[in-house]
């Protein structure tokens, strides 16, 4: 397996190509994103209903009367079901994206193509299980090391309390050591996410086994770690700047409309949020696919998308 090295400029090239790809096939991607959001909301509703029924019978406000062991078992069962059902759907996203990126015809049916191949489905489940175990081991090991060294360990209780109570003053009072450890978790999580998504493309789009796909994803990430970290840093700055501008413009628009009708402003805010989600899903999968294709896959250049073909 040849693992190719990419530069920061290559990664920005994938990002630009992703925007163009989503723009060219806007309708197909939006329908796929709508199906995905509907599936997520349905799973979240069912999960909430199951857990809620598990807590039924508890006195109002009496946390001690809840059977937490039963809740934990239900939560574990939900995670197990998700581990079985979700991977083929994600694989379908990469199949759909790959066809569009390579200029092939694609349809919403490609989202569910992973469910029709039992052998591949088993590989996807195995990959998801291995990835989950590795993620817990690495992140858990990092947290244990930080606690053993006393880095931010004294602030964990304060952080959890501040999160639950939405207390910004308590958050501001956390030590610099805690924030350094917290930044480390985010960094490690981002690197692991990249490795797992590269490996997931490998297991979903090739005949490579689950274990070898995990190894390939990790190896490809480590080989491109320097460029990846620089790209992440640059993107962090870009995202912060873009978020501030978008939030300001959206806030001004919603505030202006709320002066006329608060219900319309609330509905507009919900619509803008949903549109953002509908755009993020295709962009994310497009970038990950192009990343995999040029580093682990066929290595061909991304399909050319002219500016005249982009429909935004």
Task: Give the label of every model feature segment.
Residues 1-312:
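Hydrophobic alpha-helical membrane segments
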């Amino acid at each position: 397996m040849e693992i190719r090295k990419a530069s920061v400029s290559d990664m920005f090239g994938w990002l630009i190509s992703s925007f163009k790809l989503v723009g060219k096939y806007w309708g197909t991607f939006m329908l796929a994103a709508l199906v995905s959001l509907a599936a997520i909301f349905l799973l979240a509703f069912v999960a909430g209903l199951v857990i809620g029924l598990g807590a039924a019978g508890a006195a109002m406000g009496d946390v001690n009367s809840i059977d937490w062991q039963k809740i934990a078992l239900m939560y574990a069962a939900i995670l197990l079901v998700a581990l079985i059902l979700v991977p083929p759907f994600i694989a379908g996203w990469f199949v759909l994206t790959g066809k569009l990126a390579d200029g092939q015809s694609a349809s919403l049916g490609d989202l569910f193509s992973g469910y029709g191949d039992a052998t591949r489905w088993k590989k996807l489940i195995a990959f998801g299980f291995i990835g989950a175990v590795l993620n817990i081991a690495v992140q858990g090991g990092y947290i244990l090391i930080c606690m053993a060294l006393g880095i931010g360990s004294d602030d964990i209780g304060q952080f959890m309390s501040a999160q639950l109570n939405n207390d910004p003053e308590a958050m501001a009072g956390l030590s610099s050591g805690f924030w350094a450890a917290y930044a480390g978790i985010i960094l490690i999580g981002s690197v692991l996410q990249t490795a797992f998504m590269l490996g997931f493309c490998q297991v979903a789009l090739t005949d490579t086994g689950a274990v070898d796909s995990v190894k390939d994803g990790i190896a490809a990430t480590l080989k491109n770690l320097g460029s990846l970290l620089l790209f992440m840093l640059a993107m962090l700055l870009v995202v912060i700047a873009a978020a501030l501008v978008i939030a300001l413009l959206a806030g001004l628009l919603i505030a202006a409309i709320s002066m006329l009708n608060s219900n319309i402003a609330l509905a507009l805010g919900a619509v803008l949020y949903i549109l953002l989600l509908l755009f993020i899903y295709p962009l994310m999968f497009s970038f990950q696919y192009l990343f995999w294709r040029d580093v682990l896959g066929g290595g061909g250049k991304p399909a050319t998308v002219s500016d005249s073909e982009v429909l935004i």
